[in-house]
Amino acid sequence: MDIRAAEISAILKDQIKNFGEEAEVSEVGQVLSVGDGIARAYGLDNVQAGEMVEFESGVRGMALNLEQDNVGIVIFGSDREIKEGQTVKRTGAIVDVPVGKGLLGRVVDALGNPIDGKGPIQSTERRRVDVKAPGIIPRKSVHEPMATGLKAIDALIPVGRGQRELIIGDRQTGKTAIALDTILNQKPGHTAGGDEKAKLYCIYVAIGQKRSTVAQFVKVLEDQGALEYSIVIAATASDAAPMQFIAPFAGCAMGEYFRDNGMHAVIVYDDLSKQAVAYRQMSLLLRRPPGREAYPGDVFYLHSRLLERAAKMGDAAGAGSLTALPVIETQANDVSAYIPTNVISITDGQIFLETDLFYQGVRPAVNVGLSVSRVGSSAQTKAMKKVAGKIKGELAQYREMAAFAQFGSDLDASTQALLNRGSRLTELLKQPQFSPLKMEEQVAVIYAGVNGYLDKLPVTKVRAFEDSLLSTLRSKHKDLLDSIAASKDLSDENAGKLKSVVESVAKSIG
């Protein structure tokens, strides 16, 4: 038999060339115990903190506790399919989510998977959920207004782009309503051909809420045409605690895409109390030592590292911004509990909502005395500064006098005038839901209030006066509104025109 060496080597070489099967090497461990959404695994010696791991059933988890002899893993989803003795493998990736404009108009879960039935997400970029906040040098101080469309907030507690403003109050005081109105108020900026700098993209993170509530919220956004520039991230009450814990970080990563690309975004965390509760549950099950109110020692760091990522970037970094509106729910107006005091100390001010005001019909139920913006008038336009400067002082005096006026009946004329003005200004700051006002319209309304044009009207007619003034301005004096909007200032000429319009409307109502 003739053995042809050249032929055999050619065949072998040919076969080796076509051999493309590469062995996949992955580090695996073994599940020691599982329960309550927490698994402990042996092995996984080189796993990183915060790394995504995968169980046999396809369920994913995140390694949080790296101990000497085992790894504590929180499970994203149900732990029913995970059994003791099963294998768990590293993925090598830290938890990340899809980001970009492809997410606009969508409802996703805490890991960025679509839950709205509209097909897969069109996104090419992914970002880690937990990254370091920008340093001191790339930032710039907050100087542009982030209009909420609510008179009580834009005039008295202005929020700027890049600010963190806390919305705090008991249940059912209208916290989500303020966030919703803020999102709806951004619609004019998103009209076709609008300036990218004027646009404000909105991200709403629902943490531990009822599914019906989230569905209702999404429906309002859809009906009002606001979903197209918004992203909704939902980790509802029935989702596992790790999903509720990670959702705000996932939302923040999506918001940072806009901030880092020279665009502007606002993110609402509704609410961080429930995130803290989910984190407490995870920490206690991982056997981390409890601290005050059984929260873990690093619950302050949990919220501070999240909220520090909201920032106004300097020109060198693209001049983008991410504004955060965290929501905290208090129990019986107790602002001195652990989580509320933590978040108040982290944020740049708070909007304090009160049940009593809400039931008195003052809506939005903002307690102007306890609410504050630590950015202040640098987040207002010149026009708003001119008219809103007075209103703060007058309302403060009114609150002080109203407390004394309960005791005495014989008040001198100046005190009576102050009380009259205060009650009318309070009435003026009321606003129905889903009716945000543009900056120039707010300026006109507040101008009428602080310059005494309402003092002669009965309090019951203040609402009618406001409606009449706005409809007159919109129909007959649109040029005046446009001029204030363009210059962002109330010039003497415009103030004169506005004065004559206000006087004629006051006459017709009075």
From Swiss-Prot:
InterPro entries: ATP_synth_asu-like_sf (IPR023366), ATP_synth_asu_C (IPR000793), ATP_synth_asu_C_sf (IPR038376), ATP_synth_F1_a_nt-bd_dom (IPR033732), ATP_synth_F1_asu (IPR005294), ATPase_a/bsu_AS (IPR020003), ATPase_F1/V1/A1_a/bsu_N (IPR004100), ATPase_F1/V1/A1_a/bsu_N_sf (IPR036121). The keyword Cell inner membrane applies. It is a peripheral membrane protein. ATP binds at residues 169-176. The record marks 371 as: Required for activity. Its EC number is 7.1.2.2. The keyword Ion transport applies. Coiled coil: none annotated. One of its GO terms (cellular component) is proton-transporting ATP synthase complex. It is found in: Cell inner membrane. Disulfide bonds: none annotated. Keywords: ATP synthesis, ATP-binding, Cell inner membrane, Cell membrane, CF(1), Hydrogen ion transport, Ion transport, Membrane, Nucleotide-binding, Translocase, Transport. It holds the Pfam family ATP-synt_ab_N. It catalyses: ATP + H2O + 4 H(+)(in) = ADP + phosphate + 5 H(+)(out). One of its GO terms (molecular function) is ADP binding. CDD domains: ATP-synt_F1_alpha_C, ATP-synt_F1_alpha_N, F1-ATPase_alpha_CD. Produces ATP from ADP in the presence of a proton gradient across the membrane. The alpha chain is a regulatory subunit. Belongs to the ATPase alpha/beta chains family. F-type ATPases have 2 components, CF(1) - the catalytic core - and CF(0) - the membrane proton channel. CF(1) has five subunits: alpha(3), beta(3), gamma(1), delta(1), epsilon(1). CF(0) has three main subunits: a(1), b(2) and c(9-12). The alpha and beta chains form an alternating ring which encloses part of the gamma chain. CF(1) is attached to CF(0) by a central stalk formed by the gamma and epsilon chains, while a peripheral stalk is formed by the delta and b chains. This is ATP synthase subunit alpha.
